[in-house]
Amino acid sequence: MYHNSSQKRHWTFSSEEQLARLRADANRKFRCKAVANGKVLPNDPVFLEPHEEMTLCKYYEKRLLEFCSVFKPAMPRSVVGTACMYFKRFYLNNSVMEYHPRIIMLTCAFLACKVDEFNVSSPQFVGNLRESPLGQEKALEQILEYELLLIQQLNFHLIVHNPYRPFEGFLIDLKTRYPILENPEILRKTADDFLNRIALTDAYLLYTPSQIALTAILSSASRAGITMESYLSESLMLKENRTCLSQLLDIMKSMRNLVKKYEPPRSEEVAVLKQKLERCHSAELALNVITKKRKGYEDDDYVSKKSKHEEEEWTDDDLVESL
């Protein structure tokens, strides 16, 4: 259960400010490592600022969701949610300048398939990359190389509680204990849209799965012009606990505000930041502190050592077959 989980104890935070501090600290720690190797100065413009890292994380998180949405065989929502949570957690304590988000996002999806027991083979997984067989083999090698690192950086807390199960539970509860609403299924589509949008925010790191699920349902009801105050007060027995009800309403308002204020990264900005990111991962700077036998995922234009044939490196454009 969530309330006894590592997610509640270690990965649910008190505020957006706390998340910002963790990310800024990860950025600072990497800068210190990079300066210590003597190749850059403390204020070198090669470094990404914390807000620039966040923009890139938003971009790659969206790419992760797009990759999962067209995955074949169809990926269950719980697996997608788990992969998304892994990605968010990883970059709370790590910098994109040290670990490239392109390979981390794929490793998150790969690990989520295993943990959530979505039976897909390694060749099937990389087969979803728009790449040659050699390129797919290269991608799989990189994923396997980073899998243990990801597990370690998640502190071996691999079980993720997503809002999808409580969401279905609330719909069942509405059907059985709230006859005022004749057909609760009319709320599903808009609520699903809300869940998709809130997955792009930090809500998973701030609120419980049941709070997110309930907010999705009530937001859907509100958009449909359906009042559900009596469901909260009577069915959820919050009538006598006005403090708890008030806190719940405040939480829901905060979540809706998260969705409203979310701004997708602009393509022009992302293009500039990706150039800075690739420079951080370039061989001449070698800011990545684990540059052991790299296969070139850091550079979109990388071509592996040529012998009898040339092998083309996979890039961001190879992540999905179609968007």
Curated annotation (Swiss-Prot):
Belongs to the cyclin family. Cyclin C subfamily. It is found in: Nucleus. One of its GO terms (cellular component) is transcription factor TFIIH core complex. Keywords: Cell cycle, Cyclin, Nucleus, Phosphoprotein, Transcription, Transcription regulation. The modification Phosphoserine is found at residues 5, 132, 304, 322. Regulates CDK7, the catalytic subunit of the CDK-activating kinase (CAK) enzymatic complex. CAK activates the cyclin-associated kinases CDK1, CDK2, CDK4 and CDK6 by threonine phosphorylation. CAK complexed to the core-TFIIH basal transcription factor activates RNA polymerase II by serine phosphorylation of the repetitive C-terminal domain (CTD) of its large subunit (POLR2A), allowing its escape from the promoter and elongation of the transcripts. Involved in cell cycle control and in RNA transcription by RNA polymerase II. Its expression and activity are constant throughout the cell cycle. Associates primarily with CDK7 and MAT1 to form the CAK complex. CAK can further associate with the core-TFIIH to form the TFIIH basal transcription factor. GO terms for biological process: protein stabilization; regulation of G1/S transition of mitotic cell cycle; regulation of transcription by RNA polymerase II; transcription initiation at RNA polymerase II promoter. This is Cyclin-H. Residues 302-311 have a biased composition (Basic and acidic residues). The modification Phosphothreonine is found at residue 315. Residues 312-323 have a biased composition (Acidic residues). InterPro entries: Cyclin-like_dom, Cyclin-like_sf, Cyclin/Ssn8, Cyclin_C_2, Cyclin_N, CyclinH/Ccl1. Pfam families: Cyclin_C_2, Cyclin_N. GO terms for molecular function: cyclin-dependent protein serine/threonine kinase regulator activity; kinase activity. Residues 297-323 are annotated as: Disordered.
